[in-house]
């Protein structure tokens, strides 16, 4: 993949990697989804994929948060709360 030059192409690159990796998760829990998103995007940052584009750490934090919520919705992950007795 070419190195992205715009914030939009950087976000698309993150989305593509996270979505592809999410398909191979053995289970879809809040923790596994959070860990996956952090691991994939942090490794892209460390590998210098975004050094040519004007994306900020704040932008990346927002992207991570949105991806986590969207994946939880896609995979119907529920936060486990204690059962309420009726």
Model-flagged regions — what are they?
Residues 1-86:
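Terminal helices and disordered tails flanking the catalytic cores of nucleotide-processing hydrolases
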């Amino acid at each position: 993949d070419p190195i992205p030059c715009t914030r939009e192409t950087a976000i698309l690159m993150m989305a593509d990697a996270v979505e592809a990796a999410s398909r191979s998760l053995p289970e879809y829990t809040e923790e596994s989804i959070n860990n996956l998103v952090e691991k994939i995007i942090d490794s892209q940052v460390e590998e210098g994929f975004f050094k040519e584009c004007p994306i900020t750490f704040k932008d990346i934090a927002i992207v991570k948060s949105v991806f986590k919520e969207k994946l939880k919705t896609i995979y119907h992950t529920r936060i486990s709360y204690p059962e309420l007795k009726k």
